[in-house]
Swiss-Prot record:
The keyword rRNA processing does not apply. It comes from Erythrobacter litoralis (strain HTCC2594). Its cofactor is heme b. Interacts with CtaB. It is an enzyme of class 1 (oxidoreductase). It comes from the Bacteria. This is Heme A synthase. GO terms for molecular function: metal ion binding; oxidoreductase activity, acting on NAD(P)H, heme protein as acceptor. It catalyses: Fe(II)-heme o + 2 A + H2O = Fe(II)-heme a + 2 AH2. The gene is ctaA. Heme binds at residues 254, 310. Pathway: Porphyrin-containing compound metabolism; heme A biosynthesis; heme A from heme O: step 1/1. The keyword Iron applies.
Length: 337
């Protein structure tokens, strides 16, 4: 049971860093630190000259030259965006240590059950990979004329974090069940779980692209978009480019694919209800809140804290989906036995 509690704590930290990552993106803070220093980067600049040096590095980015600079950014404003990127990176280091040190302790004491060492190592590899992927994302906006990081790399960074979150939750649930039933075997992923997960994956991918392309600003009305229902996509470069780059089309797809996700999640919630009523309620509550916050984000013209709450609820939706999928997978195994 101690291992399960530990993984729940790490999962809570991942939810927190997802929210902080949302703030970092929405405040345009991601390119404020233009280098990656694993050790020396732990501390922020401690003198005015050090702050000025960091600001000078940021002023070389396309974001500053084309957006922040013309908007009149000064050193005080730079310190604000620097804080969020620095905090995001620090929290990433905390997550790494919060996973590695207890894992080593449990490993040395022989407390990790058979069959789980490889899974825990895979989760730790995902955590390390997140750090590398985060820098790979930032690097896409450094030394170029881009005013934002690549939305493809941004989506990979977010989706990997949420995959890690689901893995932590799933493993914690397996370990909790094992502590209660010594001969329990890991839950399996069922067909309905695959269906709901794939549809939710597409919705989160679209949401990440919307965030990365600032496509939330394409329309501030709902359900219509700027007076119309269907978008008029930019097809000058073909449909593939439009489906991956056109802000208006991606905004449209994100807001309406959400209803496909709702249907899939309702099916999942109904399937799990006989086995775990709380998981069913969690799924319904999470997607209901997600939809309301998504609409509120649009109508508020992408208010920072509403948009952050929308992303935070997305992480909670991933947790509730993993919980429901695990409950169904556990019940199916029990029935088969």
């Amino acid at each position: 049971m101690a291992l399960a509690r530990w993984l729940w704590v790490v999962a809570g930290l991942v939810v927190t860093i997802v929210a902080i990552g949302g703030i970092t993106r929405l405040t345009e803070s991601g390119l404020s630190i233009t280098h990656w220093s694993v050790v020396s980067g732990i501390l922020p600049p401690l003198s005015e000259s050090a702050w000025q040096a960091e600001f000078d590095l940021y002023r070389q980015t396309g974001e500053y030259r084309l957006e922040s600079g013309p908007a009149g950014m000064d050193l005080a404003a730079f310190k604000f965006i620097y804080f969020w990127e620095w905090f995001h990176r620090i929290l990433g280091r905390v997550i790494g240590l919060a996973f590695l040190l207890p894992m080593m302790w449990f490993w040395i004491r022989g407390m990790i059950p058979a069959g789980y060492r490889g899974r825990l190592l895979a989760l730790f590899a995902l955590i390390c990979g997140q750090g590398a992927l985060g820098w790979y994302m930032v690097a896409s906006g450094v030394g170029t004329d881009l005013t934002d990081v690549s939305h493809f790399r941004l989506s990979a960074h977010l989706l990997t974090a949420l995959f890690l979150l689901a893995g932590l939750v799933w493993t914690a649930l397996d370990l909790r069940r094992l502590a209660r039933v010594p001969d329990a075997r890991p839950a399996r992923f069922t067909g309905v779980a695959w269906m709901a997960s794939i549809i939710l994956f597409i919705q989160i991918l679209l949401g990440a692209w919307v965030a990365g392309l600032n496509a939330g600003h394409a329309s501030y009305s709902w359900p219509m978009m700027n007076g119309g229902l269907l978008p008029q996509p930019d097809l000058t470069r073909g449909w593939l480019w439009a489906l991956t780059h056109d802000p208006f089309l991606l905004h449209f797809l994100h807001r309406w694919w959400a209803w496909v996700a709702v249907i899939a999640l309702v099916v999942l919630a109904r399937k799990v209800r006989p086995f775990d009523r709380r998981a069913s309620i969690a799924v319904h509550s999470a997607f209901g809140t997600m939809v309301v916050l998504g609409i509120a984000t649009v109508l508020s013209e992408v208010s920072l804290w509403i948009a952050v709450a929308h992303q935070l609820t997305g992480a909670l939706l991933v947790i509730s989906t993993a919980w429901a999928a695990h409950a169904i997978g556990t019940a199916r195994k029990t029935e088969a036995a």
